[in-house]
Structures are given as structure tokens and as C-alpha cells.
Design a protein with these regions (language model features):
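Gly/Ser/Thr/Ala-enriched C-terminal appendages of enzymes
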Residues: 1-30, 34, 44-45, 283, ...
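N-terminal, Lys/Arg-enriched amphipathic/low-complexity engagement segments
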Residues: 30-87
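Short coil/turn segments at secondary-structure boundaries
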Residues: 71-72, 139-143, 157, 448-455
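Buried, small/hydrophobic-residue-enriched core segments of structured protein domains
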Residues: 1-30, 40-42, 77, 83-92, ...
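Short amphipathic alpha-helical segments
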Residues: 52-55, 136, 428-432
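Hydrophobic residues within beta-strands of alpha/beta enzymes
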Residues: 196, 257, 285, 307-309
Length: 486
């Protein structure tokens, strides 16, 4: 449909505008450092689950301007020498990132991009687009997983997703967050995700009754989960499922029944009773119907007899918070001597003031307890493991502090690209999910609560904090002086 298309123009127009400014001013190759972070954990949660790195890599690997890209930019009025620069464009970025499945927190760098200024500027939109969506879905799935514990969680949201790409990559993100499988066949194929499908109400309506529909399904498929709420769950649907299961006997594997409507707590208890009394104690009860972590928590409080959870709309759309709000800010720029100079963005809102400098985030873990004590942000090049103790204090409320001893410090940001060359081996999706579970187990329970979690410590090294305060003072004075001169 769109020949010679590429994702390189998957960006905002002002990025191209700024690139041309940098090019015309001769500063497009100046070294710069940008960092991605979000200001508030999503869903009022205690953490987020990082996802999207694999798609960032796919995007950066193909970052070139096609002829149709250049023709289109020419039609917008960009000049010849700038277009020639774009024609010869070769990605030279150095990228560090959290690993997919890492638990990440507000106000810490989760992706860091370094390289020629114009190139850093170009990739902002796509990176934020990817991280904002996939991290949100992975976090939502993790919240649901924390409520259902070890029970199966299936992603059922494709038809409600915001178009096809969102369905595919959202499914993958949901698996990172803890989903066991999906109804999306293409996602199963692309990412080797287990797929599960039962049947819709349409099958029953086509045959006119549950009995004929269930028989037809059982004649075709050995593994059977019957949808029992088309007409009357307790008086027709479940008794008919039991009847067909008995008639077919060993010819089918009667896995259970699915409920998609009604009072799931009450109905599931009655269904469980019917299945048990009929001699099918191993048949599972599958539930769907606009579920999320809050609904499931409520159902569990009512002791609902549900074995498998199918979560669709409210997972794939991150229904209660459809945006993460991650931002991409410049933190350092090359000066006239070839050294990186720290930069800062000021704001009337304290939470929107950026933290200057190229940084590393260290996950501080107690050797004694094996639990994460907090994240400690230092300038790049500092090795926290050489320190016997750490002074950690809140960057806003500095009187809140603690000293940590006998710890291990692991860097959060790992090398993905070095000067345009991919140096990171992408793990499989199952490896990412296992890693995410391991990291989740290291978090104290008070940070994992679905409701009113405790704030996880994300602290600045004292020199960064002091430099930030000094830069705020310097930039305000400079801004006032410039304004006064006018």
C-alpha cells in the first residue's frame, strides 16, 4: 500500500525542523545526551515494568531515509543540502537502556541516547511512542498478575486494542508483565506465545441451542472449553456442557467452561458445584467480562470459584490510565572544548525540573535480605560497589534519608548500541518474563500493593543533587539578567 515506506519519518515535524536548524548552524554533529524517564508511576502503582526495547532495536536498525521520505520532505520545503545530509544518514547513536522486565520507577533514566545532536533529536518521538505504550501495558499486566498470584492469565484484548500494532505489541508487553498466553494468533506466531481460544456466542446462535453447538465443537476439537452463558448459564449452559462431556467421554478433553456475563462471584460458585457434583472436579472455570485487577480483587474477596482469567479491554488499552507520560530530555551537550556540559530544564512545577548530567542508575540490594533497598542515581563512571556505605536521601525532602551497608549495586542502564553498532543480545520473550518475575520477587511487599503502595526510594547522589541546585540558581539568574537587558 505504501511502497518504500519506513519508520524513519515516524516522528514529529518539529524534530525535523530542529534537525535542519542544527544542520544550518553547523552543530548537528555536536555530541549530546538525552534521557527518557517518567514523572509518576502509572495507575498510582509502586513501580512500572519496562517494556519496548525489542521494538526500539528494530526501529533503530532500520533508521535510514528512503527516497520517498526524501521526496516528501522536499515537498514540505526542506532545502537541498539538508536533504543530502539526510540521504547519507547513518545511525551513530550510543544507547543504554533498562532491560525489558526490569522494574523501573519515577524520575530515573530508563533509556539514555548519546551521539550527534541531530540524530538524538530525530529518535525522540518513536522511542517515547514505544516506551510509553508497552511499559504501560506490561505494568497493567503485572498488577493483574499480583492479584491472581499463580492462576493462569490470558490476554483477550485484540478486538479492543487501538489498531493492529497495538494489539500485537501490547500482547507481547502483557506477557512480559505476567500473562501466560493470548487469543491473538499472529502474536502467538511472531513471539512464540501460547494461544488459547474457545468459541463465541455466535456458534451457539448459529446452531440455535447449546447442545447442537457444543456437539459440533466437540466433533471438531479435542480440547473443549464451552461458553455457557448464551441463554442461561446455570439452567441450560452448564448442564448442556456436562451432557456433551459425558456423551463424548474420552473422545474429547473437557477442559472446562467459560463465563462471560452476570454476577461472576455468585455464578462461578454455582458452576463449580454443578461440575463437581457431575463428576468433573478437574474442569476449570474460565472468566472474562471487562475484568481488571480491581474487579478480580473484589471477586477474590467474595471467594469466586474462577480458575483462569481472561482479561481484554482493560488490559490492552490500559483502561484507567491510557498514557504513561514518559519524557525525553537533553541532559548534556558538547561544549567548545569537546567536553560534555550539563544542562537543565526549569519549570514553575518542581516535578518538571530535569536532573542534569549523563547518569547511571544503581539498584541497591541488601545482601542479607535479598531485597531491593532503593535506586541510587550517580553520574556515569561512578562505581558504587567500591563504597562501603551509601547515604541515600530524598531529592525533594532531603531530611528523609538512610544509610545502607552490606549491599550489592547493579547498574540499571546496560549497553544496547555503541556508536550505531548493536552490542546487546536480545533475550527471548520467555526469558524476559522469567527475569521480570525474579525482579518482582526482590521488591518488598509494601511497594507491590495494588492499593496505596509505599513510595520506592529513588535517590540522587549528593554531588548530582548539589549540581542541580547550583544550576537552577545559575539559570534563573541568567534568565532574569537576559530579561532585564531587554
Amino acid at each position: 500500500m505504501f511502497p518504500d515506506d519506513s519508520l524513519t519519518l515516524h516522528t514529529d515535524l518539529y524534530q525535523i525542523n530542529m534537525m535542519q536548524v542544527y544542520f544550518n548552524e553547523g552543530i548537528h554533529n555536536k555530541r549530546a545526551v538525552f534521557e527518557v524517564y517518567f514523572r509518576k508511576n502509572p495507575f498510582n502503582n509502586g513501580y512500572a515494568v519496562f517494556a519496548g526495547l525489542e521494538r526500539i532495536v528494530a526501529y533503530l536498525n532500520d533508521l535510514t531515509f528512503s527516497q520517498t521520505d526524501l521526496d516528501y520532505l522536499a515537498s514540505l520545503g526542506y532545502n537541498g543540502s539538508f536533504l543530502e545530509y539526510l540521504r547519507d544518514f547513518k545511525m551513530q547513536l550510543t544507547v543504554r537502556s533498562a532491560k525489558e522486565g526490569d522494574l523501573v520507577f519515577a524520575n530515573e533514566p530508563i533509556v539514555q541516547v548519546e551521539g550527534p545532536l541531530a540524530q538524538c533529536q530525530l529518535v525522540e518521538t518513536a522511542i517515547l511512542n514505544i516506551v510509553n505504550f508497552q511499559t504501560l501495558i506490561a505494568t497493567k499486566a503485572a498488577r493483574i498478575r499480583s492479584v491472581i498470584e499463580d492462576e493462569p492469565l490470558m490476554e483477550f484484548g485484540t478486538r479492543r486494542a487501538q489498531e493492529m500494532d497495538a494489539a500485537i505489541w501490547g500482547t507481547r508487553a502483557a506477557v512480559i508483565g505476567g500473562a501466560n498466553g493470548t487469543s491473538n494468533v499472529r502474536a502467538g506466531k511472531l513471539f512464540d506465545i501460547p494461544v488459547l481460544g474457545t468459541h463465541a456466542h455466535a456458534l451457539v446462535q448459529v446452531y440455535g441451542n447449546d447442545y447442537e453447538a457444543f456437539k459440533a465443537y466437540a466433533s471438531t476439537h479435542r480440547d473443549c472449553v464451552f461458553l455457557v452463558d448464551t441463554y442461561d448459564t446455570l439452567r441450560i449452559g452448564v448442564p448442556t456442557a456436562i451432557r456433551v462431556a459425558r456423551e463424548f467421554g474420552d473422545k474429547i478433553n473437557f477442559l472446562g467452561v467459560r463465563i462471560d456475563s452476570g454476577d461472576l462471584a455468585y455464578i462461578s460458585k454455582k458452576v463449580r458445584q454443578q461440575l463437581d457434583e457431575a463428576g468433573f472436579p478437574n474442569a476449570k472455570i474460565y472468566a472474562s467480562n471487562d475484568l481488571d485487577e480491581n474487579t478480580i480483587l473484589n471477586l477474590k474477596m467474595q471467594k469466586a470459584k474462577i480458575d483462569v482469567w481472561g482479561v481484554g479491554t482493560k488490559l490492552i488499552t490500559a483502561y484507567d490510565q491510557p498514557a504513561l507520560g514518559a519524557v525525553y530530555k537533553i541532559v548534556a551537550i558538547e561544549d567548545e572544548n569537546g567536553h560534555l556540559r550539563n544542562t537543565i530544564k526549569l519549570s514553575n512545577n518542581a516535578e518538571k525540573v530535569s536532573t542534569p548530567g549523563k547518569k547511571q542508575v544503581w539498584r541497591i540490594t541488601s545482601r542479607e535480605k535479598g531485597k531491593s533497598e532503593g535506586d541510587y542515581i550517580t553520574y556515569d563512571g561512578v562505581d558504587v560497589n567500591h563504597q562501603e556505605e551509601l547515604e541515600m536521601f530524598h531529592p525533594t525532602y532531603t531530611y528523609i534519608n538512610k544509610t545502607v551497608k552490606n549491599f550489592d549495586a547493579v547498574p540499571l542502564l546496560v549497553d544496547i548500541y555503541k556508536e550505531g553498532q548493536l552490542v546487546y543480545d536480545l533475550p527471548s520473550l520467555s526469558e524476559i518474563q522469567d527475569y521480570a518475575r525474579q525482579e518482582f520477587d526482590k521488591l518488598w511487599d509494601e511497594y507491590k500493593r495494588v492499593l496505596n503502595p509505599q513510595d520506592y526510594p529513588v535517590d540522587l547522589a549528593r554531588d548530582i543533587w548539589q549540581d542541580k541546585m547550583d544550576l537552577i540558581d545559575q539559570m534563573r539568574k541568567k534568565a532574569y539578567q537576559t530579561g532585564a537587558e531587554k
